[in-house]
Amino acid sequence: MDVPYDLTSYIRVLKLASTPSWEEFSQIAKIAGAGIALVGLLGFIIFAVMTFVPGSKPV
Protein backbone atom coordinates (compact mmCIF):
# COMPACT_ATOMS: atom_id res chain seq x y z
CA MET A 1 0.00 0.00 0.00
CA ASP A 2 1.56 3.24 -1.17
CA VAL A 3 0.29 5.85 1.27
CA PRO A 4 1.69 8.99 -0.43
CA TYR A 5 0.21 7.91 -3.78
CA ASP A 6 -3.15 7.20 -2.16
CA LEU A 7 -3.18 10.57 -0.42
CA THR A 8 -2.42 12.43 -3.64
CA SER A 9 -5.23 10.53 -5.35
CA TYR A 10 -7.65 11.51 -2.59
CA ILE A 11 -6.56 15.15 -2.75
CA ARG A 12 -6.99 15.20 -6.53
CA VAL A 13 -10.54 13.86 -6.23
CA LEU A 14 -11.41 16.41 -3.53
CA LYS A 15 -10.11 19.25 -5.71
CA LEU A 16 -12.30 18.12 -8.62
CA ALA A 17 -15.41 17.65 -6.47
CA SER A 18 -17.79 20.55 -5.99
CA THR A 19 -20.90 21.10 -3.96
CA PRO A 20 -24.09 20.75 -5.99
CA SER A 21 -26.32 23.71 -6.67
CA TRP A 22 -29.63 23.91 -4.86
CA GLU A 23 -31.50 22.84 -7.99
CA GLU A 24 -29.28 19.79 -8.47
CA PHE A 25 -29.58 18.82 -4.80
CA SER A 26 -33.35 19.24 -4.91
CA GLN A 27 -33.63 17.04 -8.00
CA ILE A 28 -31.45 14.31 -6.45
CA ALA A 29 -33.51 14.44 -3.23
CA LYS A 30 -36.78 14.10 -5.16
CA ILE A 31 -35.49 11.12 -7.15
CA ALA A 32 -34.14 9.40 -4.03
CA GLY A 33 -37.39 10.05 -2.17
CA ALA A 34 -39.42 8.64 -5.05
CA GLY A 35 -37.23 5.52 -5.06
CA ILE A 36 -37.68 5.01 -1.32
CA ALA A 37 -41.45 5.51 -1.64
CA LEU A 38 -41.58 3.04 -4.53
CA VAL A 39 -39.76 0.36 -2.55
CA GLY A 40 -42.06 0.95 0.43
CA LEU A 41 -45.14 0.74 -1.77
CA LEU A 42 -43.88 -2.48 -3.32
CA GLY A 43 -43.33 -3.96 0.15
CA PHE A 44 -46.81 -2.92 1.25
CA ILE A 45 -48.38 -4.46 -1.86
CA ILE A 46 -46.55 -7.74 -1.23
CA PHE A 47 -47.68 -7.65 2.41
CA ALA A 48 -51.29 -6.97 1.41
CA VAL A 49 -51.29 -9.79 -1.15
CA MET A 50 -49.75 -12.24 1.32
CA THR A 51 -52.37 -11.27 3.90
CA PHE A 52 -55.19 -12.39 1.61
CA VAL A 53 -53.52 -15.59 0.36
CA PRO A 54 -55.00 -18.56 2.23
CA GLY A 55 -52.54 -20.46 4.39
CA SER A 56 -50.00 -17.67 4.71
CA LYS A 57 -49.30 -15.79 7.91
CA PRO A 58 -47.94 -12.25 7.86
CA VAL A 59 -45.03 -11.69 10.17
Curated annotation (Swiss-Prot):
UniProt keyword Transmembrane helix present: yes
Compartment(s): Cell membrane
Biological process per Gene Ontology, one example term: intracellular protein transmembrane transport
GO MF term (any one): protein transmembrane transporter activity
Gene3D superfamilies: Preprotein translocase SecE subunit
Record's subunit section: Component of the Sec protein translocase complex. Heterotrimer consisting of SecY (alpha), SecG (beta) and SecE (gamma) subunits. The heterotrimers can form oligomers, although 1 heterotrimer is thought to be able to translocate proteins. Interacts with the ribosome. May interact with SecDF, and other proteins may be involved.
Protein name as catalogued: Protein translocase subunit SecE
Organism, scientific name: Haloarcula marismortui (strain ATCC 43049 / DSM 3752 / JCM 8966 / VKM B-1809) (Halobacterium marismortui)
